[in-house]
A protein has these predicted regions:
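Domain-level signal for Mg2+-assisted phosphodiester chemistry and nucleotide/NA-binding surfaces
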Residues: 2-131, 144-149, 198
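Nuclease catalytic cores that cleave nucleic-acid phosphodiester bonds
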Residues: 113-229
Length: 229
């Protein structure tokens, strides 16, 4: 009598906190001139490596969800110099728009965009704030590059949490991989694990708090470090 074993490939959803990914990616590869094409390709490769990290088990990609905000595109005046700044013309804005376009071209990538809220204020950069508090510099020593306009992401964490819950409750995947670095995901991760989903965290080599280990099923980073020449 012949016995046939039917192997069903498990499905994986990969959720990416875009702001976290970009911050860690630039730190890891030591790239001072961001390229949207290279960045999109690096993210794609990083995600694909997760599907094949187990020698005896391969996963089928359900979808990559990329969470971020549309870049700020209004005009503001620097309070130190009075200089007008058109944020739609900045390198950051142009990079973000180009990166989103590249990601839209990738197979099975879905953009989930929140809102970048205008804080309506300028803040002194942290390193300069420390210098001021220590008395190493005075306010008169500040330059226009020492302050930055205050932006706050809205709805990104909420979208990540809702998607984790929805995917888990609908039994759409067997595994969820979250590329992120904070603990805001813990309630959603708990729900996913209770629903039988294998929940992995990729912090891109960033240290995580010890208590987070009890809320995940594994920790794994795939992006390779590049040393500065």
């Amino acid at each position: 009598m012949s016995i046939f074993f039917i192997h069903t490939m498990k499905k994986t959803a990969i959720l990416v906190d875009g702001a976290f990914f970009l911050r860690r990616y630039r730190n890891i590869i030591k790239d001072t001139s961001p390229d949207p094409v290279k960045t999109a390709n690096a993210l794609w490769t990083m995600c694909m490596l997760h599907l094949y990290k187990e020698k005896n088990e391969k996963f089928n990609l359900y979808r990559i969800f990329y969470y971020d905000c549309l870049p700020y595109d209004k005009k503001q005046h620097n309070p130190l110099t009075g200089k007008a700044i058109d944020f739609s013309k900045t390198e950051t804005h142009q990079f973000q728009v180009a990166l989103f376009e590249e990601l839209r071209k990738k197979r099975k990538v879905a953009l989930r965009l929140g809102i970048l809220e205008d804080g309506n204020k300028w803040i002194i950069k942290p390193e300069k704030t420390k210098a001021l508090l220590k008395g190493n510099i005075t306010v008169k020593d500040l330059t226009e590059n020492d302050i930055q306009f205050d932006f706050k992401q809205k709805m990104v964490d909420m979208k990540i949490g809702i998607d984790i819950a929805s995917i888990a409750l609908k039994k759409q995947v067997d595994q969820i991989i979250l590329i992120a670095g904070d603990s805001d995901f813990v309630p959603a991760a708990k729900l996913a694990r209770r629903e039988g989903v294998d929940f992995l965290l990729d912090p891109m080599w960033n240290p995580i708090k010890p208590n987070l280990f009890e809320h995940i099923d594994g920790l794994y980073s795939t992006l390779k470090y590049k040393t500065r020449k």
